[in-house]
Amino acid sequence: MKALLVLEDGFTLEGKSFTGDFETGGEVIFTTGMTGYQEILTDPSYYGQMVCMTYPLIGNYGTCREDMESAGVHCAALLVKECCKKPSNWRSTMSLPEFMKRYEKPGVEGLDTRALTRHLRMNGAMRGIISTRETDPAVLQERARALPAMKGHNLVPFVAPEKPYAWYDNAVQEVTVAEDGSYAWRGTGLPLLVYDFGIKWNILRRLCEAGFEPLAVPPGFSPARAKASGAKGVFLSNGPGDPATLTSEIALVRELIHMLPVTGICLGHQLIGHALGARTEKLKFGHHGCNHPVKDLTTGRIEISSQNHGFHVVLDDVDDVEATHVNLNDQTLEGLRHKTLPVMSLQYHPEAAAGPHDGEYLFNRFRKIIGESAGA
């Protein structure tokens, strides 16, 4: 079935749907990972985005339950050069087309993904529409222009949980948290309050491996309830959308950093930046992929990192805050810490999924910060 992709500037490509009849829109981006398509599809941070895979053959190893990063698919669409219909992998339980159809998400192959990637690299990520129903590019261009821009758009409410939950036995578990915030911890690790703005499950796995007992809570979980919970630290998760729009969450973080040790990844890092007086700017085409070089300024160590963000933190000489990590491709900020408060954060994804594990040590670094804070 023919599918037409049209960007807001009129750039047009023709492909073929491998998931049936549809029309959908969103911000069109590209990711440079050769693998990890299932993790990308199920990462809530990709909510509202149509993802172009730069590697030409996608779906070779199928899909499986173990590679899920949430309970569903959040990408608006998957754009590939060629989709493999018959995977070869002993772990696979479903082909990529079957997986996409199960979650009712569009997939398109036969696109010139190289041309699309070059266009986005030169002109920036932009809104687009892909349709099997409308054949007039001018009509689809107007529809693309009518879509909300990512800048200024709060997408967290679409992916955040409505009530608290725990993570153990490698799964989400229902729990009861009292009205005042008090909670009966299981005693399996250091109590950690996790603000879920659209978290990846592998972050929760890595927190457990680092010796934490995570309790995930919705974005509206108040500082008073956080204090009453008995948690020894706070973790702020990844998530979609423009961080500058999350004014109530920024105010929340501003209080939390004076109560407990705090760390964050991706959107959580950006919220910490805002709370400390920094600002965020939108990147031209974002950082999406498993091969971004980062330098840890505290050790001089170079890491290859997994990244997925369209915004970045700009410090602008913020008092008492220093950079800890920098991206070696474009020199943008990848990590920060407060000089006196037990606060640190990272823009990239040390939990990987998919990607290299060079940054896993940072979960233990935060645990050490909590220990030092408790002993102070």
From Swiss-Prot:
Coiled coil: none
Name under which the protein is recorded: Carbamoyl phosphate synthase small chain
Disulphide linkage map: none
Alphabetized GO MF terms: ATP binding; carbamoyl-phosphate synthase (glutamine-hydrolyzing) activity; glutaminase activity
Record's function text: Small subunit of the glutamine-dependent carbamoyl phosphate synthetase (CPSase). CPSase catalyzes the formation of carbamoyl phosphate from the ammonia moiety of glutamine, carbonate, and phosphate donated by ATP, constituting the first step of 2 biosynthetic pathways, one leading to arginine and/or urea and the other to pyrimidine nucleotides. The small subunit (glutamine amidotransferase) binds and cleaves glutamine to supply the large subunit with the substrate ammonia.
Pathway named in the protein's UniProt entry: Amino-acid biosynthesis; L-arginine biosynthesis; carbamoyl phosphate from bicarbonate: step 1/1; Pyrimidine metabolism; UMP biosynthesis via de novo pathway; (S)-dihydroorotate from bicarbonate: step 1/3
Enzyme class: ligase
SUPFAM superfamilies: Carbamoyl phosphate synthetase, small subunit N-terminal domain (SSF52021), Class I glutamine amidotransferase-like (SSF52317)
Record flagged with keyword Magnesium: no
Family note: Belongs to the CarA family.
Lineage: Bacteria, Pseudomonadati, Thermodesulfobacteriota, Desulfovibrionia, Desulfovibrionales
Chain segments carrying region CPSase: 1-187
Keyword annotations from UniProtKB, A to Z: Amino-acid biosynthesis, Arginine biosynthesis, ATP-binding, Glutamine amidotransferase, Ligase, Nucleotide-binding, Pyrimidine biosynthesis
EC number from the UniProt entry: 6.3.5.5
